[in-house]
A protein has these predicted regions:
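N-terminal post-signal-peptidase region of extra-cytosolic proteins
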Residues: 38-46
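Non-catalytic, surface beta->alpha helical segment in thiol-disulfide oxidoreductase systems
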Residues: 58-94
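Short, glycine/charged-enriched secondary-structure capping and boundary segments
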Residues: 23-26, 49-51, 72
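Structural motif
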Residues: 2, 45-48
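Solvent-exposed loop/turn segments at secondary-structure junctions
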Residues: 15-18, 40-41, 63-64, 72-73
Length: 94
């Protein structure tokens, strides 16, 4: 995972698509938040097989789930859907 913490949510996007940045990404709780510009880090994009931006990937050491944009380069997933995945990981740790 590209993160320091175990539980981490990464938004992969590109500068040219910044109008479709996922605004609520930084408001997720109980996880590390990371933003990676694939235009600046193409090697990271290929390592994680990012084919469309934005893509949000939830990691718990390794990839747990990904949410990908549709053909309009926007993500349909909601903050609560992604937070649910994070909460599920944390619940499993107890």
């Amino acid at each position: 995972s590209p993160c320091e913490a175990d539980v981490c949510v990464v938004q992969f996007n590109a500068g040219w698509n910044s109008g479709n940045d996922v605004e609520w990404h930084g408001k997720l709780k109980d996880c590390e938040i990371k933003y990676i510009d694939i235009a600046a880090y193409p090697d990271v994009a290929s390592k994680y097989e990012i084919v469309v931006v934005p893509t949000i990937v939830v990691f718990n050491g390794k990839e747990v789930k990904r949410f990908q944009a549709d053909i309009s380069f926007a993500i349909a997933a909601t903050k609560s859907e992604v937070q649910e995945v994070v909460d599920g990981i944390l619940m499993d740790q107890f």
